[in-house]
Regions:
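The conserved Walker
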Residues: 103
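A short acidic (Asp/Glu
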Residues: 136-138, 205-209, 216, 233-236
Length: 395
């Protein structure tokens, strides 16, 4: 249950850190949220395991409501680093900027700040490549969104195109992740007002090689490293494409999330995109479906591989699997339904094929299915991550 709303005074040059689940409303004075200026009746929402910095230059009174586990903390300074403001001021009207940094380094906050400070000059394109903690698309996907007005959160942007990757991190299968980014890049074309957010996988040679490839594919004009140390390979890749490389500080206050919190955030997102799902059954011969990551493999063989691997791992739910059907086990493979000229797939949980030859899946989508691409993440019917299929091909 949300707590009773309380009014908190925020002193001049101070920041109220709203920790979700929580909401706030400006009662008196003025606020700035990552470059966004809310009105007095607007409710600002911090989702679970996320935070919003509400900065007041001259002081304000804010009405705050906290959900279970939420919080509010006032710090006596502006938590946005000075070098963020300097970076924003240095950008002209045309730029393609990519932000790279480790998890919980403030990448999304920086992208949001740059978006809000530049969108008043004209529309902005945002590419979200963080397939595990995306703001604008489901987990296991990357996306493009076009924005035309400021917003306290990038989650308010509607995706223009969504590209399934199949995993929650490029570390599972970098080749597949790069293929998806290349497809996204071809859609962007020569767009000159672009912000690119990336995932937080930066430690190790494979991670740095992957980020270098992102630079080479997207050819940004600016590469921004946030809170990072030595990165010679990223410097080299930036020089190859003629990008200006800049280092900026992490925010002064960052909400740290452990592995379980990031997993819980993904599960909330699955639930959001699968809300209203029901079990559908259609004859297998009517369904055009293929494995997303092994397009040449027959779907039935892929199902056997998924179920067999779970059995080898001694997963307890496989005892309830009946042949190629997982309905009784209450699990399904996260999949992507395409129809018509839509550029955003609907999500589904593919439960397998029953002994009567019917394909069974949970989805909120009610229309005709042109293609179902079956991914690699296994979820329960209450949208918990149960298992991830190991890549069978080289990364």
């Amino acid at each position: 249950m949300p707590s009773e709303a309380k009014r908190l005074p925020v002193g001049p040059n101070s920041t109220l850190i709203l920790k979700g689940p929580a909401s706030a409303r400006l009662v008196e004075g003025s606020l700035e949220v990552l470059g966004y200026r809310p009105g007095s009746k607007e409710r600002l929402v911090a989702k679970p395991w996320r935070s919003l910095p509400l900065y007041s230059r001259e002081g304000a009174i804010v009405e705050v409501s906290l959900g279970e586990g939420g919080g509010a903390e006032i710090v006596g300074e502006d938590t946005i680093p000075d070098d963020w403001r300097e970076l924003s001021s240095s950008l002209g009207d045309s730029f393609r900027l990519m932000v790279i940094g480790m998890v919980d380094s403030g990448k999304t906050s920086l992208i949001t700040y740059l978006y809000n400070t530049h969108v008043p000059r004209g529309r902005m394109v945002v590419a979200d490549l963080d397939m595990g903690q995306s703001e604008i698309c489901p987990p296991t996907t990357i996306a493009l969104a076009i924005g035309g007005k400021p917003s306290p959160s990038l989650s308010a942007l509607e995706p223009n195109r969504v590209y399934p990757v199949g995993y929650t991190s490029p570390s599972y299968l970098t080749s597949r992740a790069l293929e998806s980014v290349a497809e996204l890049s071809s859609t962007i074309g020569s767009e000159r007002r672009l912000l690119v957010n990336t995932d937080g996988w930066v430690d190790g040679e494979a991670a740095r090689r992957h980020k270098s490839q992102l630079i080479r594919i997207l050819k940004p004009s600016h590469v921004v490293l946030i809170g990072m140390g030595e990165a010679d390979d990223l410097v080299e890749a930036s020089e190859e494409v003629g990008a200006e490389l800049t280092r900026v500080s992490a925010p002064k206050v960052v909400l740290k999330r452990d592995h379980s919190a990031r997993k819980a955030l993904r599960e909330l997102s699955y639930a959001r995109y699968l809300r209203g799902a029901r079990l559908r059954s259609i004859p297998r011969r009517w369904l055009r479906a293929r494995p997303l990551l092994l397009a040449g493999l027959p779907l039935e063989d892929y199902l056997r591989e998924v179920i067999g691997e779970m059995e080898e791992s001694a997963h307890h739910l496989t005892m309830l699997v009946n042949g190629l059907e997982m309905t009784e086990a209450g699990i399904g493979i996260l999949s992507y339904i395409w129809a018509g000229d839509r550029h955003e797939p609907s999500l589904a949980l593919f439960m397998g094929i029953d002994d009567k030859g019917f394909a069974r899946f949970y989805t909120p989508y009610e229309g005709t299915i042109e293609l179902m691409e079956v991914g690699a993440v296994i979820l329960s019917t209450d949208y918990r991550e149960v298992y991830v299929l190991r890549p069978r091909i080289n990364v």
